[in-house]
Amino acid sequence: MSQDSKPSKANAGAVVEPSNFLRQIIDHDLASGAFSQRTNLAGEAIPSIITRFPPEPNGYLHIGHAKSICLNFGLASDYNNQPGGARCNMRLDDTNPVKEDVEYADSILDAVKWLGFDWGTHLYHASDYFDRLYEFAEILIQSGKAYVDSQSADDIHTNRGNFGQAGKNSPFRDRTPEENLQLFRDMRDGKFKDGEHVLRLKIDMAHPNIVMRDPVVYRIRHTDHHRTGSKWCIYPLYDFTHCISDALENISHSICTLEFENNRPLYDWIVNSLKELGVFKDPVPHQHEFARLNLTYTITSKRKLLQLVEEKHVEGWDDPRMPTIVGIRRRGYTPESIRLFCERIGVSKADSWIDMSTLDQALRDDLEVRAPRATAVLKPLKLVVENFDAPTKEACSAPRHPNYPEWGNREFNFTRELWIEADDFMQEPIKGFFRLYPPIDDQPGSRVRLRHGFVVECTGFETDAQGNVTQVNVTHFPDSKSGTPGSNNYKVKGNIHWISAAEAIPAEVRLYDHLFTDPYPDSGDKNFLDAINPNSKQTISAYLEPCMKDAKAEDRFQFERHGYFVADQSDSKPGKPIFNRAVGLKDSWK
């Protein structure tokens, strides 16, 4: 994939019919009858189409995983309405006790549920199959298709050769099945140290695909497993476990990303070998690859994400700048917006870059419909209405959503002292500035409408000793209140928001931007850390309208004129709100 290829923005705002070559494959298989009237090993009827999502619990899921989740569960949902039915299994590929953890496993299940998908009773673990995997390994040994190799890891690596050079057979390749079987059982029984022996498949050390050069499928690890404890000291590797787990679960279409394309011949070799040996029967699963998600301004390498966390470039796995599911959830993204995003980008065989704006637009399109409106002043500047008496209050209201009157109104008061945005005032206005500015020469100050309130005219301003504006003074026109007959008598171009200073709710607001300044921070020989955006998080003190006081964690709003915000999942409390900016009203990244 070329790093110079332009990311796609064409579908950022439009709903399009996603391309999906996998549907064509499934349709063909169904039409051919390849997966009709299927039964499992026990003879029980099973759905024609079974997909699966099988992450390894060695880290937190990220936005790239969301594409696979939506694809596999989405296909199952769509084809469940067709003859034969369909389902998607949830499987945790937990075969490496060194890197896996219950924390990661729990977070994966939570993320899939949060995205809106349900596996019902079909939750599986690769560790559930350890006994069967061992049994099948013995069958392969007895048939002469696997052997115990006693070379060191370095020698195994060296003797594999490279793309231009064939590998060398191990000096232990011709051990008899009986000797291999005894050694393998001794490995299982803990008689050897880590790394002393491995089990390899006997395929072809001169194969043009290096993956097929007698791959290692079992290794010794004297490490307890988080589910099986100390029962095992040998563990199967991914390539061995993955395809056999698919076959045991009767997966019809094993869907994975393109980086596993070279592993497909090994997948087929293992499954077909066990079929020939009477373990499995047709139809056996087949692997299909699709292009992974490449999102601009983002990295998805687990190793590099871990580095960001451990070196404290971010504040944890759920930092709203992280591409993890827990991170983008805390940022304010909704399950619906992520599913919409995955639908819009479609599925293909060719790698490409998707612009971050496509994901952002999916969130805007979702929250535009569902998020109630509210007022927030992010850069407060005091506004004093000179001809409005201090004790007086004028009741005002605004719709919770302009398109849904049934949602009702927000109620608030107009008072003498208000908060407005500092950006809504200029001492010396530039051309085209239609908000507040003071009298200039013989000309009166500007007039603007305070939204849902009155028209006001600027009469002056005050500054501190450093010349910073600290207060803007205005007069209001009592007959100009929004919604009253007299309001139409005032024609103004500026329309700004405000909050009563007496009723404003203090709040912390966190303004997030891209974590990286480079759209391709991980490309070529770049050090991705050099592209970290030093301004990716800004924390400010703001004011919110009164109705926001008791906002609950993960409540989402459109702060009018600003964007979409969410009450922080971890830190926001009723009476002490903390809001994160999820996305602006429009794409503002340059």
UniProtKB/Swiss-Prot annotation:
- Positions annotated to bind ATP: 56-58, 62-68, 257, 292-293
Location(s), subcellular: Cytoplasm
What is the residue range of the motif 'HIGH' region?
55-65
* Residues that, per the record, bind L-glutamine: 93, 238
Q: Which GO cellular component terms, listed alphabetically, does the Swiss-Prot or TrEMBL entry include?
A: cytosol
Quick check: keyword Transferase in the entry?
no
- One Gene Ontology term from the biological process aspect of the record: glutaminyl-tRNA aminoacylation
| Keywords carried by this UniProt record | Aminoacyl-tRNA synthetase, ATP-binding, Cytoplasm, Ligase, Nucleotide-binding, Protein biosynthesis
Its EC number is 6.1.1.18
Instruction: Tell me which InterPro entries the record gives.
Output: aa-tRNA-synth_I_CS (IPR001412), Gln-tRNA-synth (IPR004514), Gln/Glu-tRNA_Ligase (IPR050132), Gln_tRNA_ligase_bac (IPR022861), Glu/Gln-tRNA-synth_Ib_cat-dom (IPR020058), Glu/Gln-tRNA-synth_Ib_codon-bd (IPR020059), Glu_tRNA_lig_a-bdl (IPR020061), Rbsml_bL25/Gln-tRNA_synth_N (IPR020056)
Cross-referenced NCBIfam families: glnS (TIGR00440), PRK14703.1 (NF011291)
Q: Which family does it belong to?
A: Belongs to the class-I aminoacyl-tRNA synthetase family.
Complexes and interactors: Monomer.
Name of the featured protein: Glutamine--tRNA ligase
Q: What is the scientific name of the source organism?
A: Polynucleobacter necessarius subsp. necessarius (strain STIR1)
Gene this chain is encoded by = glnS
